[in-house]
């Protein structure tokens, strides 16, 4: 079996970096990926793909990328489920990223507060 995904798109918001109780960095990002064709109105639509990044990949992406950054993500599709507060099973499909390539001409560091 083969499960590999390669995407190029722009971050829809700043990476959401957190740490697990074991100290592992994890970040969640959403990529806006343009479709390769135009709709009936002549506009290019985008798909919004949720991605999860771990460890150094998560930390580096949070450090060097922000909303609007152009990135390339390679990884695999993963599905999982959990029970929400109302007791309803929620199913999630996301990309578990192996690598993230920063594709802007120059990485943009976040401004110090």
Swiss-Prot record:
Subcellular location: Cytoplasm
Gene3D superfamilies: Nucleic acid-binding proteins
Post-translational modification: Phosphorylated by YwqD, which increases ssDNA affinity; dephosphorylated by YwqE.
SS bonds (residue pairs): none
Gene knockout outcome: Transformation efficiency drops 10- to 50-fold. Destabilization of DprA.
Taxonomic lineage from the root: Bacteria, Bacillati, Bacillota, Bacilli, Bacillales
Protein name: Single-stranded DNA-binding protein B
Residue list for modification Phosphotyrosine: 82
InterPro entries in the cross-refs: NA-bd_OB-fold, Primosome_PriB/ssb, ssDNA-bd
Keyword Cytoplasm: yes
Native source species: Bacillus subtilis (strain 168)
